[in-house]
Amino acid sequence: MNIDKPQISLKNISKKYGKHKILENINLDIYEGDFICIFGKSGGGKTTLLNIIGTLEEYDEGELICFSEHNPIRNEKESEVLRRYKIAYLFQNFALVDNMTVQENLNLAVKYSRSTDKKSIIKKALMDMGIEDKLKSKIFELSGGEQQRVALARNMVKPYEIMLADEPTGSLDSENKKIVIDTLVKLNKLGKTIIVVSHDKEFEKIAHKNYIIENGKLKQLEFAVEK
């Protein structure tokens, strides 16, 4: 684990939508094995910041350094490599293909794995998420909680070092919420870097570093859990 050099470094990142500056001079270093949660009001810039970290959205000012690569968002080829092999994204709306089966959705992700036994990787991910019996089910046949577990399994079968999670427990019942949180904690203990944006105060208890976005500014909160 490299604790000397950040995996991701944001330097004076700013972003506008029209005349409204939603992010202003954001500075954040993210290290391997971090578990970070970012809180804030709806529409306050949390998801925008997550998208910038994941190279899904451009910023107007500042500098983004990902795995020692300067400003990868300016180079689409570098951004694509990061998204395929370094960064996994757990979207709020799951981002699954509704008319495909669970297996077909996972096949889209596992193709980037260097393992020669991709079937075993899929089987283990589904068992870890407790949905191995849903392999042949279409996504639209599943509950919201089951879909989020499929989305997590999809990320687990692809190569990644950082997982970004946008409101991962927002629409889940208590059982599925516990499964998702426990899985994120387990992945973090295995060395994965986890970055969550959420309204869920449960993350206060498990994150190593907690932040809040207020009026476009990122502020670190005092409560946190040691690694």
Model-derived regions, located:
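Conserved structural motif at the start of ABC-family nucleotide-binding domains
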Residues: 8, 23-25, 82
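Helix-to-loop junction immediately C-terminal to a conserved catalytic motif
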Residues: 54
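ABC ATPase NBD Q-loop/coupling interface
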Residues: 63-81
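Conserved signature/switch motifs of ABC ATPase nucleotide-binding domains
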Residues: 84, 137-140, 157-158, 190
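ABC-type ATPase nucleotide-binding domains, specifically the catalytic core motifs of the NBD
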Residues: 104-119, 128
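Conserved ABC ATPase signature
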Residues: 138-142, 146-148
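Catalytic Walker B motif of ABC-type/P-loop ATPase nucleotide-binding domains
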Residues: 163-166
